[in-house]
């Protein structure tokens, strides 16, 4: 299994309970597809470098995990259809 890092930004006007549920849901998507989560780092609300979908701020979440491409592909597929996630990106951790 390779190491990966996923960073995603949640829209800032979502309720805190819904935000927590969203983070748990996407963590579960990874683990259900065979990934082992090492660390979930919630960076909090930050200003975006540029406006995305009329939002100037966003709630940043970074997940470090070990897993396969299938886990990333499923995360990517579901994140694209979720209106609460305004941007996401996955990279391979070379460490």
From Swiss-Prot:
Keywords on record: Ribonucleoprotein, Ribosomal protein, RNA-binding, rRNA-binding
Tell me which InterPro entries the record gives.
Ribosomal_bS6 (IPR000529), Ribosomal_bS6_CS (IPR020815), Ribosomal_bS6_sf (IPR035980), Ribosomal_S6_plastid/chlpt (IPR020814), Transl_elong_EF1B/ribsomal_bS6 (IPR014717)
What Pfam families does this protein's entry cite? Ribosomal_S6
Sorted alphabetically, the Gene Ontology BP terms of this entry are: translation
Residues annotated as coiled-coil are: none
A single GO CC term, please? cytoplasm
Q: Which GO terms describe its molecular function?
A: small ribosomal subunit rRNA binding; structural constituent of ribosome
Query: Could you name the domain of life of the organism this protein comes from?
Result: Bacteria
Q: Which HAMAP family match?
A: Ribosomal_bS6 (MF_00360)
Q: What is this protein's function?
A: Binds together with bS18 to 16S ribosomal RNA.
The UniProt entry, under PANTHER family, shows:
MITOCHONDRIAL 28S RIBOSOMAL PROTEIN S6, SMALL RIBOSOMAL SUBUNIT PROTEIN BS6M
Q: Which family does it belong to?
A: Belongs to the bacterial ribosomal protein bS6 family.
Query: What is the protein's given name?
Result: Small ribosomal subunit protein bS6
Q: What is the lineage of its organism?
A: Bacteria, Bacillati, Bacillota, Bacilli, Bacillales
């Amino acid at each position: 299994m390779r190491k990966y890092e996923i960073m995603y930004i949640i829209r800032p006007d979502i309720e805190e309970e819904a935000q927590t549920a969203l983070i748990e849901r996407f963590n579960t998507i990874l683990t259900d597809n065979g990934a082992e989560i090492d660390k979930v780092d919630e960076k909090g609300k930050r200003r975006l470098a540029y406006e995305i979908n009329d939002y100037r701020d966003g709630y940043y979440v970074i997940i470090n995990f070990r897993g396969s491409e299938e886990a990333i592909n499923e995360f990517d597929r579901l994140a694209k259809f979720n209106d609460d996630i305004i941007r996401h990106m996955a990279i391979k951790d070379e460490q």
